[in-house]
Amino acid sequence: LAGIAGAGAIAAAVVLLPVVLLCVQAFVPPFDALMISTGSEPLRLLPIPFSAEQWQMLFNQSTYWQAFWNSLIWTVGACVVQVMVAFLGGYVLAKYPARWCVAIAGLYTLMMLMPPQMTLLPIYRVAYANKLLNHPMLLYAPIAFAPFGTFFMRQWLLRWPDELTEYLRLEGGSSVKLLWYCLAPYSLPGMLALFALTFTEGWNQVEQPLMLVSDSLRQPLSALLKDLSAGNPQIVFAASVASILPIALVMLAVLVQQGSKRKAA
C-alpha cells in the first residue's frame, strides 16, 4: 500500500507541476512575464521578484470582465438546467418498468459516443436558418440537455432500492414527495458531481464559440483568452490562471461538501 501511495503522489505531482509553474509565472513582473512567454527567459521556480501587476492590468480591462460574466452566467444556468433535466430524466429511465425506457437509455449511450464536434455543423445550419447566430444560447443549450447527465443520474438512481419506493407509496407518498424528500437528498452527491463536470465542460468551450459566436461582446472567456493575451502578452500567465480559477473553486467546493458530509455521517 505504501508503494501505491508513493506512486500516486508522484503521479499527482507530475500532473500538478505545470499548473504550479503557471501560477508562479502569474506573479512575476509584466516585463519578465513577457520575456518568459517569448522564450527569452526560462520559467521561474519562484516568483522573484514578486509582483501583482499582471493581475492589475488584467482586471483593468473591461473586455475581461465582459467575457467573464458571459461565461459565468451562462455556464451556471446551463449547469442548473442540466442537473434538473438529468435528475428527472434519470429517474424515469431508472425506475419506470417500461421497455421504451431501456431503449431510450441505449440511445442515450450511443449519443454519448458521438464527439461534440460532430454536432457543430448541424447546430450551425439550424442557427443560420433561424437567424440565431451570435446568441450565447447556442453554446450552452447543447450542454444543458447533453445525454451524459441523464445517463449519469440513471446509473446513480439504479442503486435506489425498488422495495423502498414501494413502501413509500404504500404509506401514501406521491411521486413529487418521493422525488423531493427521498431521491433528491439521496442523489445530491451525484448532482453536485454532475454540476462540477458540466461546469468544466461549459467553461472550457473553444471550438463552439469560434464557430457560432463571432461577436466579441458575447463570446465567453475561453474564446477571448487568446485575444487578451495577444493584445497584452505580458499578462498571458495571469489570464491563464484566471481562466482556470473558477473551475478549481467549483471542484474544491464539491470536495469540501462531500468531506463535511462524510464527517457528519
Q: At which residue positions do the language-model features occur?
A:
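A structural signal for multi-pass alpha-helical bundles of membrane permease subunits
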Residues: 4-265
